[in-house]
A protein has these predicted regions:
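Sec-dependent bacterial lipoprotein signal peptides
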Residues: 2-21
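Extended surface/linker regions that mediate inter-domain or inter-protein docking
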Residues: 49, 60-331, 342-345, 355, ...
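Acidic/polar, low-complexity intrinsically disordered N-terminal segments immediately downstream
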Residues: 31-73
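Long, compositionally biased, intrinsically disordered segments
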Residues: 29, 33-36, 44, 54, ...
């Protein structure tokens, strides 16, 4: 019997460790710094180790010959014949209109790659590849284009190399590298480029692009095929492959429509009419919620910040990229603008077609069927078309220059039409300073002196009409806020500031209406937050409107034993997440939450969203500890329990699709040695309260029901492993009702997941390059 129990325990340990070993994720990843190599199986690869490649030259007679080099993740020559290694080549040229056209097409007549040519080894990882496609033969090339040795147009050869390998953790991952080589057939220097969007900008949100199976990771490669020739028509095979009435998968069209998502007018119209909106393959993008946060509801959730993508950056190999990034504002065309404004018409049309339903790819008996659908909807007539002339896009810049002289915010310029409130001249700034906190002792009412200014250092009143400012006072006994005796479910004291007394020097003073509990010990905090209102001027589309913008919240720490300020970061609440990293996707964290009052500082969030905080007693009570609900919120559609359901109040986050690899903890967490997300957690981290017990104001472990701290962190993403909670050997998986030891960390996670082991989060959660 003992042998059987030991076997079952060992098997259970193996299964649980396997479940905890990694997260499923999207297509994107982010590079991280490599820690010292671990003692593991010889030849095993770190999960961010990547291949290296370069194109050294291109010669063309009839079939292009590319000279290239392949190296493995250690910089050693890589055999092109290595099992599982995929090597593909692309060749395209820039037309006079600035778009690419591809020489190579697939059987269905769509832009593609060449991979059936001939390789020759030159030694030291250097090879030549001779294309199978004769680009001097119009019957062999896409659309019959041919090559000329005297052509002055820019040509781009590109290489995609990839393979799937096993990492040190035992999981498989894909190594991939995309490289390009620009040249002119006439031998002169390249002067024309199409470097409009650098993949480094994409990777701010996506971590690491990886589409078409994960091997295509650079926008410089994407645009060679995703050009205006890639149009999917209604019918099958050749009859509609270039049909202008089809759905375009040109890069700018596709990317703009995907990111507009549920804010795309065509999607709104199509869904209202009973359709499904824009989609590709089996994926629908009609409900995508763009993550930009703004106090302007017209902009929030919309990719209005064009420079988020259209800016100088680097390609996937770290090379400077983006020479043409300003074309978004310098070259307006009907085609470009209607990728987002897709129901706008520039003529007298009473109906306009928008993309609707998914494009399908159906392999048949020797043929491939591409099909996409459109739906006629009511258009929005462009205000510049006054009806007495045929609108031509050469007129666009007459009304819509790239910029106007002086202030461009909300002007007719291209820049002005894409204004983000918090980056505009309308928002004059909102800055907080806590000058002092007196009487900050248990049983006393703290007296706080503070200042509010704009960006020109002008003093602002906390009682200004339309403004709302407040202080939050909480305390931590060890490393987490507890706020015992202050408010229901771990909430801090709150003090509005409109009644503060002016001191005559631009500062104000207020006394808390409620005293600090006499039982409070440790380190206290006063957090300052608030918003002011601003008026966005009327535009051609919207009437003038008043909106709220919050200033960046700040914190002042003090010793509850002495009342003196605590400036030592080691005694303050630990910093686990950097708001700047959140802003890579969100623009301005919190700008559209809590009436915009709590913005741009996660250290303010945790004063309320602490381990003792819940949604309140009741049947649906759950923790709102920051790590728990933020992990769940971003896991979204990948949650396993309750059919993937996750709601807080009236907000349903069950359909959230995170845009990058969720294993990439450094997307949000600050780095460190060891990383802040590594195990063990800091000493004395509290478990997350899931039920406040009989007394909502008492967070003591004999009253609250908690989930142990490491379990709480892991289950917020790995929510499907709660099936193991019935195994008593795993303290990590046992709910801890009122047990002090369990509630504060009696867990067995470290036996398998401590830093330095293969299944440690800092290794198992390291995303691939």
């Amino acid at each position: 019997m003992r042998r059987y129990n030991l076997f079952c325990f060992t098997l259970s340990m193996f299964v649980v460790v396997s479940l905890l070993g990694g997260c499923s994720g999207g297509s994107g990843n982010k590079e991280g710094q490599q820690p010292p190599p671990l003692a593991t199986t010889p030849g095993a690869i770190l999960p961010d180790g990547n291949l290296q490649a370069e194109i050294q030259g291109v010669t063309i007679n009839s079939r292009p010959v590319v000279t290239f080099r392949l190296l493995d993740e250690n910089g050693a020559p890589l055999d092109q014949k290595t099992a599982g290694l995929s090597v593909r080549f692309f060749l395209a040229r820039i037309k006079d209109d600035g778009n690419y056209e591809n020489y190579v097409g697939d059987a269905a007549g769509f832009p593609s790659y060449d991979a059936t040519g001939t390789f020759a080894a030159l030694g030291n990882g250097v090879y030549t590849y001779t294309f199978a496609t004769d680009i001097n033969d119009a019957t062999k090339t896409l659309k019959g284009i041919t090559y000329s040795a005297t052509d002055t147009r820019t040509h781009t050869a590109a290489l995609q190399v990839s393979r799937t390998v096993a990492s040190k953790t035992g999981a498989s991952f894909q190594q991939a590298r995309n490289v390009r080589f620009d040249f002119r057939p006439d031998g002169q220097a390249v002067t024309t480029t199409r470097e409009i969007v650098a993949v480094s900008a994409c990777n701010d949100c996506h971590g690491k692009l990886g589409v078409h199976g994960g091997g295509r990771r650079d926008t410089a490669l994407c645009i060679l095929c995703h050009n205006p020739d890639l149009v999917v028509g209604y019918d099958t095979n050749s009859s509609a492959k270039y049909d202008a009435a089809g759905v375009s998968f040109d890069f700018k069209v596709m990317i703009h429509k995907i990111h507009m998502g549920k804010k795309l007018p065509g999607n709104v119209a199509a869904i209202t009419a009973g359709g499904t909106g824009y989609g590709i393959g089996n994926a629908s993008y009609a409900t995508v919620a763009y993550p930009l946060m703004s106090g302007d509801s017209k902009a929030s959730g919309t990719p209005i910040e064009c420079t988020k993508c259209h800016r100088h950056g680097t390609d996937s190999n770290g090379n400077v990229y983006g020479k043409d990034a300003d074309r978004w504002k310098e070259a307006p065309t009907i085609g470009n603008c209607t990728t987002c404004h897709d129901t706008t018409t520039f003529d007298a049309a009473v109906r306009i077609d928008v993309a609707d339903a998914l494009a399908t790819v159906n392999p048949g008996a020797g043929t491939i069927s591409y099909k996409a659908q459109r739906r006629a909807v009511n258009p929005v007539r462009h205000t510049g078309d006054v009806g007495f002339f045929v609108f031509d896009e050469t007129f666009c810049r007459v009304c819509h220059p790239a910029e106007v002289t002086g202030n461009n915010s909300y002007q007719m310029s291209i820049t002005g039409h894409h204004t983000v409130l918090e980056q505009s001249s309308v928002y004059t700034g909102l800055n907080f300073v806590i000058l002092s906190v007196a009487d900050a002792l248990p049983g006393r009412k703290p007296v706080v002196t503070f200042r509010i200014t704009d960006n020109l250092n002008n003093a602002l009143s906390p009682a200004a009409v339309g403004s709302s400012f407040a202080l939050r006072l909480g305390y931590l006994r060890q490393v987490d806020y507890v706020n015992d005796g202050m408010g229901s479910a771990g909430q801090p004291l709150s003090q509005p500031l409109e009644t503060a007394t002016a001191n005559g020097d631009g500062s104000f003073t207020i006394t808390f209406a409620t005293a600090i509990p006499t039982t409070a010990t440790g380190v206290g905090v006063v957090g300052m937050e608030g918003r002011s209102t601003y008026t966005i001027p009327a535009t051609q589309k919207y009437a003038a409107r008043t909106v709220g913008v919050g200033g960046k919240s700040i914190q002042y720490f003090f010793d509850l034993a002495t009342g003196s300020q605590v400036s030592d970061p080691a005694r303050q609440r630990r910093i686990s997440v950097a708001a700047e990293r959140c802003n890579n996707c969100h623009g301005r964290l919190g700008a559209s939450l809590h009436d915009a009052s709590r913005a741009n500082n996660t250290q303010q969030c945790v004063i309320c969203h602490n381990p003792n905080a819940t949604t309140g007693s009741g049947a649906a009570e759950q923790t709102i500890n920051l790590k728990d609900f933020i992990h769940k919120l971003h896991t979204g559609e990948n949650l396993a329990l309750s059919g993937g359901s996750f709601t807080i109040g009236s907000k349903d986050f069950s359909k959230v699709k995170y845009p990058r690899d969720r294993r990439d903890c450094l997307a949000c967490h600050v780095d460190g040695d060891p990383p802040r997300f590594a195990l063990p957690l800091p000493a004395n981290v509290l478990g997350s309260t899931t039920a406040v017990g009989a007394d909502p104001n008492n967070a003591a472990v004999d009253d609250n029901v908690r989930t142990t701290p490491m379990k709480a962190a892991c289950l917020s993403c790995h929510d499907n492993i709660s099936q193991w909670s019935a195994i008593p050997q795993f303290g990590i998986l046992v709910h801890a009702p009122g047990n002090a030891a369990d509630a504060n960390g009696a867990e067995l996670c470290l036996s398998c997941h401590r830093t330095g082991l293969l299944q440690s989060p800092d290794l198992a959660h390291r995303p691939v390059r």
